[in-house]
């Protein structure tokens, strides 16, 4: 196998060919930096966090595939993943995970001690998450914590503290993550039931759409409070309204609980997050 072919496999293992996860991680992280800075964040901090999100998302994907390597081959959507298909060895995957983790830690060391301390919690959460699908019906709720951890880190990097407003944004992103990752889990629900993987899509059962709606409403409320705490104005409010519109569209997509529309609803959350981030940024400009 050529070096080019091997590199392509490593990139797929790190999910570099599917940026949706990186984008969903990026928008709340950037929102946190903007809110913490009261506008334009420090350029060094901004660059470190953008690179860090990409690297840590790759770490999360690699350790997730390691944990699920024996199950992914039985799930239609995941059977072609490099570890499940045997394109890379466990040793190669774990080596890549360590390398990416060291890169992420090197980035963190350029920031203040509080960020470094928070980063240890972040990597532990990242490693634990894939295994929660074995012993809890609520792995999406744990993922919400993992995917929101960049928010207190962003505030710490920008201000040296983690104020109350940061935790409102954390709560908003946690609720939003549970909502969209449950949509994602609805895609795999039938396969997950066969192989014994647990998820909120299975836990919520016939009430899945209603519970997702509740989490969307809770996320909306927390985003509003976070904006109010930061004294945001009309443009941010328009972003909130746009976020509501995307949420309603997602509810329409998941109504029939079919795989393709549910996956489309999950992907649509990228635009919901982008619209809210852009609205926040423009709100500071005007």
From Swiss-Prot:
Cross-referenced NCBIfam families: ubiA_proteo
Described function: Catalyzes the prenylation of para-hydroxybenzoate (PHB) with an all-trans polyprenyl group. Mediates the second step in the final reaction sequence of ubiquinone-8 (UQ-8) biosynthesis, which is the condensation of the polyisoprenoid side chain with PHB, generating the first membrane-bound Q intermediate 3-octaprenyl-4-hydroxybenzoate.
GO CC, alphabetical: plasma membrane
A Pfam family: UbiA
Cofactor(s) needed: Mg(2+)
Locations listed in the record: Cell inner membrane
Mode of membrane association: Multi-pass membrane protein
The organism of origin for this protein: Shewanella woodyi (strain ATCC 51908 / MS32)
Keywords: Cell inner membrane, Cell membrane, Magnesium, Membrane, Transferase, Transmembrane, Transmembrane helix, Ubiquinone biosynthesis
Entry EC number(s): 2.5.1.39
Catalytic reactions of this protein: all-trans-octaprenyl diphosphate + 4-hydroxybenzoate = 4-hydroxy-3-(all-trans-octaprenyl)benzoate + diphosphate
InterPro entries with a match to the protein in the record: HB_polyprenyltransferase-like (IPR006370), Prenyltransferase (IPR039653), UbiA_prenyltransferase (IPR000537), UbiA_prenylTrfase_CS (IPR030470), UbiA_sf (IPR044878)
Gene3D superfamilies xrefs: UbiA prenyltransferase (1.20.120.1780)
Pathway(s) per entry: Cofactor biosynthesis; ubiquinone biosynthesis
PROSITE patterns per record: UBIA
Record flagged with keyword Transferase: yes
UniProt KW Cell inner membrane keyword: yes
Family label: Belongs to the UbiA prenyltransferase family.
Molecular function GO labels: 4-hydroxybenzoate polyprenyltransferase activity
Descriptive protein name: 4-hydroxybenzoate octaprenyltransferase
Gene: ubiA
TM helices/strands, residue ranges: 20-40, 43-63, 96-116, 142-162, 167-187, 210-230, 234-254
């Amino acid at each position: 196998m050529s070096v080019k072919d091997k590199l392509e496999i490593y990139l797929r293992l790190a999910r570099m060919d599917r940026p949706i996860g990186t984008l969903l991680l990026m928008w709340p992280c950037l929102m946190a930096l903007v809110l913490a800075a009261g506008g334009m964040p420090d350029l060094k901090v901004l660059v470190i966090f953008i690179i860090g999100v990409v690297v840590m998302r790759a770490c999360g994907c690699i350790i997730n595939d390691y944990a699920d390597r024996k199950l992914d081959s039985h799930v239609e959507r995941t059977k072609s993943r490099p570890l499940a298909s045997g394109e890379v060895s466990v040793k190669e995957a774990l080596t890549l995970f360590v390398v990416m983790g060291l890169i992420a830690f090197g980035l963190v060391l350029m920031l203040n001690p509080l960020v470094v301390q928070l980063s240890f919690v972040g990597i532990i959460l990242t490693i634990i998450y894939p295994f929660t699908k074995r012993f809890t019906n609520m792995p999406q709720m744990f993922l919400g914590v993992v995917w929101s951890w960049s928010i207190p880190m962003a505030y710490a990097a920008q201000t040296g503290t983690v104020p109350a407003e940061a935790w409102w944004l954390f709560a908003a992103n946690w609720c939003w993550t549970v909502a969209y990752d449950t949509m994602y889990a609805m895609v795999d629900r039938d396969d997950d039931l066969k192989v014994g993987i647990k998820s909120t899509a299975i836990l919520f059962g016939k009430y899945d759409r209603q519970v997702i709606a509740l989490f969307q409403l809770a996320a909306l409320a927390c985003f509003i409070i976070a904006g109010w705490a930061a004294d945001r104005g009309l443009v941010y409010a328009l972003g909130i309204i746009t976020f509501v519109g995307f949420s309603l569209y997602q509810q329409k997509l998941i109504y029939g609980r079919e795989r393709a529309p549910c996956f489309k609803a999950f992907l649509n959350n990228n635009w919901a997050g982008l619209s809210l981030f852009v609205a926040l940024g423009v709100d500071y400009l005007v």
